[in-house]
Structure formats: structure tokens, C-alpha cells
Amino acid sequence: MGKPNLKDQIKQLYLVLLEEIKIFILTIKLVISKKNVWIISYYHFLKKVVVSKKQILNLSRLLLRFTLLSIFILFVLDLISKYITAPILTGIFNFIFKILISLVNLLYKAIYWIYIIFAIFLHFMNYLLVLLELTLQPIFEWIEIFFFNSLIYFLKLIFLLYSNFEKGILIFLMWLKSRIKK
């Protein structure tokens, strides 16, 4: 006997694939139509869908292939999520949190030094007022009491509010970072 023709081999392969696709589509149609497929035994279900034992064998092969392929895909996706995606996202979030924490620390230090400079300036102005007070006490008394002392206390209040706000931001960032690590 001679070798089978390439055209016949392609035709045979096409018929086998077409048969498997029909079986798969019929299976999906039965499942989608919500008939009581799984109440009946699986063999009877296969008999409803297909006619010959060859088709049952083809269907079982097809189901086995899809099962193995889906197990492999799920395994690969699990590996990707555990060892690639999670460390990358954790690294990105750690980097972002470190930048945010360092920016908050820089802002805290900047406001602290601005407060010190303003406090020194206001104390210096207060000392100048005390010096001028000796000569022009009636004029400058109300300026010192109402303006500079209240301004110093106002700046202290702003600094205290900011420091508590900054601590709240740091606590929130630490909490968020611990939630992401879980």
C-alpha cells in the first residue's frame, strides 16, 4: 500500500477536529440550557450527546486535554502571582511609601525650621519693642500685647496641629503598608 495522500490526511484531520468541536459545542449547549446534566450519570450524559464509542473516546480525550490545560494555566498564573507580581507590587508600594515618608519628614523639618526662624524673628521684634517701650510705652503697649504675642501663640498652635496631622499621616501610611503586605 502506498502512503496516504497529503490531501486525504488533511481531510481526515479536518473531520476529526470538526467532530471534536461539534461534541464540545453540544456539551456546552447542554450545560447552558440548564438541563439536569449532572444528576444523570456521566456515561448516560455522554450517550445523550454523542452516538458512537469513538465519539465518547474523543470527548473524554478533549475533556482531559481541557482539564490538564486549565490546571496548567491555573498553576502558571498562581506562580506568576506569588513570585512575580506580588514582589513587584510590594517593591513598588514600598518605594512609593518610602518616598512619601521622606517627603513628609522633609516637610516636617522645613516647617520646624520655618517655625524656629519665625519664633526667633518674633522674639527679636519683641525685644525691639521692649527697647522702644521704654521710651514710647503708651503707643507700643497695645501692639505688643495684641499682635506679636498672639502671633507667636498662633504659630505654636499651627505647628502643633501640623505635627499631629503629620503623625496621623505616618500612622495611616504604616497601616496601609501592613495591609498591603498581608
From Swiss-Prot:
Keywords: Cyanelle, Plastid. The keyword Plastid applies. GO terms for cellular component: cyanelle. It is found in: Plastid, Cyanelle. The keyword Plastid applies. This is Uncharacterized 24.3 kDa protein in psbH-rpl11 intergenic region. The lineage of its organism: Eukaryota, Glaucocystophyceae, Cyanophoraceae, Cyanophora.
